[in-house]
Amino acid sequence: MSDGATAVARPRPGVRAWPLYVGGFLGPYASTMVTPMVHEVAVGLRTTPEVAAAAVTTYMFPFAAVMLVSGTLAERWGRARTMQLSLIAFVVACACCVLAPTIEWFLAARALQGVTNAFTTPLLVAAITDLVPRAGLGRALGFFAGMQAAGQAASPLVSGPSAVLDWRLAFAFPALVAVVLAVLPPTMTAGPRPTGPPPVRALLNRNLALACALSFLCYFAAVGLTVLAILRAEEDFGLGPWQRGVLAAGFGVAGLLAAPLLGRRLDALGPWRTGVLMNLLLAVGLVVAALGPSVLLLGLGVAAVGVAVTGLRTTVNAIAATSTDGNRAGAASLALSFQFFGGALAPLVWVPLHAAAGGLGFAATALAPLVGVGLAAREWLSRSGPR
């Protein structure tokens, strides 16, 4: 990237921007951090792995539900104040997970983690959109999506080894990140905010509706992959915990490495064309991961999905946050809410289908991005005009 291009992607001078990107790490990390240590949590809290696995859903459903309104509420209460209080509450939630004496208390603490993160992630997207000049917004949101991918990559790499000693140690890392961000908060606005309540009716627009649909479909497929790929790695190829952790980390690592290029492509191609390409890549990656006859092809499929999801996160965030100027945080939180509703629903749909139909049930996850291709292609062609 040239110096000029790099400068365009940076926020305006005089702002503290790095916490915006570090904050993007927390949501994806926290959502999946229990997955690699489900068995250890089950043993520690005297329950079954199936019950302990509900820790993912009990995080995602409150996270998604609260994000329906969290961005708009934060615009009303003040972004900076909301961000700082939410980070402190997240630290408290991590402590509750560590101290939980039973699975019921643990799941309640996971739900609290989800609620607190619902007041951080959309505010970060809104702040980046405000602070970065429009010409470099794709690159900035691409970097943010890369940090989200880093959170997904780090989750199994931290949780897995922590669980070898004591699964409760895994919660120290995200709590420490939240403490740093609370002490050194990011700049949240580019200047004085409009007075009065943020416009809720402005959220009823076509671009935001499409962003919500693409966001839902993306995570509905991708979270299905994160669960089914681990099941397939163990059942079909006999991979152990460390090997499965490395496989799962490949999803986030691939997205992190591809993020700068994806941001530049978004700036060059626009969101709708990028949405078509990323959904096609997502569909191909899902089929390869589901039906590939070797561990290598399974890993390549997981990596391709990781790249596609990072590209779609960037695309959806750009569409949503620019759809409603007077309520950016509300728009961003609404799109993110649909994303995590898709993620929360995914295991409930795809795991039984995989159990019933095997590889074909896994490959069925590709139907979701194919619908996304249709939505994005229709919008792209309608905006391209006659040739």
Where are these regions (language model features)?
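Helix-breaking motifs and short loop linkers at transmembrane-helix boundaries and internal kinks
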Residues: 46, 78, 99-105, 238, ...
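Conserved MFS/SLC helix-loop-helix module at the cytosolic interface between two early adjacent transmembrane helices
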Residues: 64-101, 266
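Paired small-residue
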Residues: 89, 93, 104-113, 296-304
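Cytoplasmic helix-loop-helix junction between adjacent transmembrane helices
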Residues: 103, 109-148
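Helix-loop-helix hairpin linking two adjacent transmembrane segments in secondary transporters
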Residues: 134-186
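A late C-terminal transmembrane helix in Major Facilitator Superfamily
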Residues: 323-357
